[in-house]
Amino acid sequence: MKQTIILLYGGRSAEREVSVLSAESVMRAVNYDRFTVKTFFISQSGDFIKTQEFSQTPGQEDRLMTNETIDWDKKVAPSAIYEERAVVFPVLHGPMGEDGSVQGFLEVLKMPYVGCNILSSSLAMDKITTKRVLESAGIAQVPYVAIVEGDDVTAKIAEVEEELTYPVFTKPSNMGSSVGISKSENQEELRQALKLAFQYDSRVLVEQGVNAREIEVGLLGNYDVKSTLPGEVVKDVAFYDYDAKYIDNKITMDIPAKISDDVVAVMRQNAETAFRAIGGLGLSRCDFFYTDKGEIFLNELNTMPGFTQWSMYPLLWDNMGITYPDLIERLVELAKESFDKREAHLL
């Protein structure tokens, strides 16, 4: 009997378009000799719509249904996704997707799911909290100032200008895929950047700009996590924003990255240490800055990295000899393993 994968995609965050791209790639790459895929679209308003079911590889003309094509009469209660022995693959990015919300819901339903649990998802989603956890684990971070809604913005800008130097990068604490990120060269630009970031979150991070290469490491496993050789993001733009990443196609990747064996060893060790520090499960992508001074800063952990066929995470594992279909299969097995342990601990 085939294993059922419940594919959740869309979502309420600003990254829902990325989710659709990732989910379509998963839908096409699944080994249909072993799996059946059932899909549910989550609308921007949070509604669950039962969309499609695939028992064999979809044709090139097949697309996952989205706002423009779904049948709203197929809206269901969120709990309707439940199916005994099915594994959920929540291909959801950003808030209300990889921040622990959906993970908690799936645990209430007693369903195994791909990826990190409630705690590690919520920790990694919040950039400020992640930095504090990683600092306690002895992992170097880019200097930063945290600003929370309600703070005296003028005083915080003065703190930024005292502790950091321009340029600085301003980021919503709970957002991914470079949404809401701005580069500031002076105080006026910083004020505008803060206004933009606060549109997405009530907690904002201002980081020191660094001249650095962007290096990424893939992680796979539960308590026995393994890492990939690093890959490098090669940019044709000033910085890695949302449009460059997903719309303008101005990003290329160098896999493996052309860095020394010593640097590779440090990055892989730090990535695995960070994954364990947050209690990671299943998968993550660990992003580093490697400065022109030879400094290595861990930038962030993505617990549900972009999963399209051209995304860094699956390409990193392909370089290690694990194909995209095999990667999906391994993630399903890891989901079942972590579910069994979670249920055993509750007995």
From Swiss-Prot:
Pfam families, per the entry: Dala_Dala_lig_C (PF07478), Dala_Dala_lig_N (PF01820)
Annotated disulfide bonds: none
UniProt keyword terms in alphabetical order: ATP-binding, Cell shape, Cell wall biogenesis/degradation, Cytoplasm, Ligase, Magnesium, Manganese, Metal-binding, Nucleotide-binding, Peptidoglycan synthesis
Residue positions annotated to bind ATP are 161-216
Task: Spell out the SUPFAM superfamilies in the cross-references.
Answer: Glutathione synthetase ATP-binding domain-like, PreATP-grasp domain
Can you tell me which residues the record assigns to a coiled coil?
none
The protein's location, in the record's own words, is: Cytoplasm
Any one Gene Ontology molecular-function term assigned to this protein's record? D-alanine-D-alanine ligase activity
Give the co-factor note. Answer: Binds 2 magnesium or manganese ions per subunit.
Q: Where does it primarily localize?
A: cytoplasm
Q: Which PROSITE patterns match?
A: ATP_GRASP (PS50975), DALA_DALA_LIGASE_1 (PS00843), DALA_DALA_LIGASE_2 (PS00844)
Record's GO cellular component terms:
cytosol
- Give residues annotated as binding Mg(2+) 2: E300, N302
| Needed cofactors | Mg(2+); Mn(2+)
An example GO BP is: cell wall organization
Q: Give the Enzyme Commission number.
A: 6.3.2.4
Task: List the catalysed reactions.
Answer: 2 D-alanine + ATP = D-alanyl-D-alanine + ADP + phosphate + H(+)
InterPro entries attached to this UniProt entry: ATP-grasp, ATP_grasp_subdomain_1, D-Ala_lig_Van_CS, D_ala_D_ala, Dala_Dala_lig_C, Dala_Dala_lig_N, PreATP-grasp_dom_sf
Hey, which pathway is this one from? Cell wall biogenesis; peptidoglycan biosynthesis
Against HAMAP family, the record matches this protein to: Dala_Dala_lig (MF_00047)
Entry similarity comment = Belongs to the D-alanine--D-alanine ligase family.
Function noted in UniProt: Cell wall formation.
Q: Protein name, please? A: D-alanine--D-alanine ligase
